[in-house]
Amino acid sequence: MCHAREASPGTGEPEAAPRDNFPRAAGSKRGVGAAFETRAQRFLERAGLALVARNVTVRGGEIDLVMRERDGTLVFVEVRARANSRYGGAAASIGARKRMRLLLAAHAFWARTGGANACRFDVVAFEGSRLVWLRDAFRADDAG
């Protein structure tokens, strides 16, 4: 019974366990992600950035946070969390394919808002309980 949970109330049938074998409430992955995004947003606001948009979804990608620096620079933020830093940690989990999707989404957002401001790509990574802010984590010309 390694890959089954206790019997469901009322049915007596065991529920299938998640693939990674760690139990979690239904929909909690999205809730956990939202909680980390909120923590990242608050951190960046305390650092002087202003929220422009959150969870921007365009064809081909999603941007967790769009912030604005005091000088007007748009900051596209990817929020990542990992329980520990094995396998390179949270920031290392943003591969070339993810960077390309972020670039496409950012370009669409930037163009839709007039395209006049400078922009950059930051990563806020949570490694266990530690927050790491990687300013200018990657550039459009090194995304591939």
Swiss-Prot record:
It comes from the Bacteria. Pfam families: UPF0102. GO terms for molecular function: nucleic acid binding. Residues 1-28 are annotated as: Disordered. Gene3D superfamilies: 3.40.1350.10. InterPro entries: Restrct_endonuc-II-like (IPR011335), tRNA_endonuc-like_dom_sf (IPR011856), UPF0102_YraN-like (IPR003509). Disulfide bonds: none annotated. Belongs to the UPF0102 family. This is UPF0102 protein BURPS1106A_3900. It comes from Burkholderia pseudomallei (strain 1106a).
